[in-house]
């Protein structure tokens, strides 16, 4: 826990495990149902688009609901496409998406609608990361198969936290290795103690899982531990790690991603991180895409520009302040802000999480950091 943020974000109960699909052949699913993810996607004009997971920025997409708590597909599709056009890639059915409040059928619907919306917008190359976490190995593998057959390219899996006390390092390693071995798409580890019963994967355990699991494609660190990120990037950048190649062409390298926007530049510049998955990306997509662009350019340029560094650090200062505001506000604040400022029809959550009141929302939108970063966001929009 850092700055109390884990207690503010997502207090999500678990649902009962789904039944494992009978007699599913991973090879059959892999080759017949998601060939577009592996071998490219034709746009109808003969052009082939090959999707590849690579460094960048992602937003965990909220699951938009109407006032009866039913899926609002139209708003969901619009939001996914609007962000993707700005370089903010989608993570569907993650913590921000209230995944553990959704049925498996609802997750499948959102996976399918994401791929359909992106393809209809001509965004064939946009990689979809799908949340497939559940409270048993069997149920998690089931969701990985469902995600694969619904158009997702990568699964992101949180540790099963209901029986957190029984999750020894060996149990966690076994869980992730069994999931990745049976998943038809690459698997990203998701370390978020606040939403996994306090389970906090150590850097040593993450490195061991990555070495032994060739279908493990990366990790998202919502623990906020910059030192852990640095240790993982150092270990996976060594020549020795090259002896453990990744299994899938969709994810040819192991990516280490932050889980908050407030240390995006430090993670990329000082920690050799590959980007981040950030709830703040739903509100300020241009600003975060610009911050990553500057940071990655500085980190990879043989002669980095002092002017670029100055710009990156100034932007990071604003991002860190706004990230703190929206972290405190959590999912309710994000949905309220999107409804109020993007014209979305509802800010409804699936209860027991309660919606923001207008009083809370008005206080959020007036916070100095929120206002200042929105000025940058609008400036970037005007200059496009």
Residue ranges and their predicted role:
Residues 181-182, 193-328:
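Catalytic alpha/beta core domains of metabolic enzymes, predominantly
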Residues 37-200:
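Active-site beta->alpha loop and helix N-cap motifs at the rims of alpha/beta catalytic domains
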Residues 37-49, 53-64, 82-87, 269-273, ...:
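C-terminal alpha-helical cap/extension of soluble enzyme domains
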Residues 26, 30-31:
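Short, positively charged and aromatic/hydrophobic N-terminal segments
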Residues 6-10:
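Intrinsic-disorder-associated, low-complexity terminal segments enriched in Asp/Asn/His/Tyr and depleted
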């Amino acid at each position: 826990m850092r700055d109390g943020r884990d207690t503010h974000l997502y207090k999500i109960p678990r649902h009962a495990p789904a039944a494992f699909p009978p007699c599913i052949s991973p090879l059959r699913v892999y080759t017949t149902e998601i060939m577009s993810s592996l071998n490219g996607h034709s746009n109808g004009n003969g052009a082939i688009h090959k999707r590849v997971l690579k460094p960048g920025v992602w937003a965990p997409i909220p699951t938009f609901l109407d006032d009866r708590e039913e899926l609002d597909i139209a708003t969901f599709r619009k939001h996914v496409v609007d962000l993707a056009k700005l370089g903010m890639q989608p993570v569907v059915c993650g913590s921000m998406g209230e995944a553990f409040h959704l049925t498996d059928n609802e997750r499948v619907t959102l996976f399918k609608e994401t791929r359909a919306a992106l393809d209809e917008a001509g965004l064939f190359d946009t990689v979809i990361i799908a949340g497939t976490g559940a409270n048993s190995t069997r149920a998690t593998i089931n969701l990985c198969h469902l995600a694969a057959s619904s158009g997702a390219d990568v699964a992101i899996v949180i540790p099963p936290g209901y029986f957190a006390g029984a999750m020894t390092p060996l149990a966690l390693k076994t869980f992730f290795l069994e999931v990745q071995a049976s998943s038809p798409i690459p698997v990203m580890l998701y370390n978020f103690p606040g939403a996994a019963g306090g389970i906090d994967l150590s850097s040593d355990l993450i490195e061991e899982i990555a070495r032994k699991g060739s279908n493990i494609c990366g990790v998202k660190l919502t623990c906020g531990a910059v030192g852990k990120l640095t240790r993982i990037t150092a270990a996976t950048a060594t020549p020795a790690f090259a002896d453990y190649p990744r299994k899938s062409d969709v994810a040819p390298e192991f990516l280490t991603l932050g889980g908050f926007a407030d240390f995006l530049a430090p993670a990329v510049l000082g920690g050799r991180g590959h980007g981040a998955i950030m709830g703040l990306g739903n509100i300020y997509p241009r600003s975060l895409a610009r911050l990553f662009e500057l940071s990655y350019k500085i980190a990879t340029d043989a002669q980095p520009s002092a002017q670029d560094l100055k710009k990156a650090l100034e932007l990071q200062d604003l991002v860190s302040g706004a990230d703190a505001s929206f972290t405190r506000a959590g999912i309710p604040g994000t949905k309220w802000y999107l409804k109020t400022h993007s014209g979305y029809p509802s800010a409804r959550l699936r209860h027991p999480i309660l919606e923001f009141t207008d009083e809370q929302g008005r206080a959020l939108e007036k916070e100095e950091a929120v206002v200042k970063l929105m000025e940058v966001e609008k400036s970037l929009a005007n200059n496009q």
